[in-house]
């Protein structure tokens, strides 16, 4: 798996975060939450690709993706990822 795949996932995450910011400014809060989740998911999948050198799993579970990518997270962050996963 090339670094380009990881970079593509991360570029998508950045674009989705921009969309989320625009939705927030427009007061489309539920749509904003969805794109925040999507941005986090893509960023975590970029990490998974970089660390495992394989395609990321077909999953929207942010904590699972963080675990697979070896992301160190305390309990508060894990709870945040669990909550954010409900916005998908």
Predicted regions and their residues:
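Terminal alpha-helical segments
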Residues: 1-88
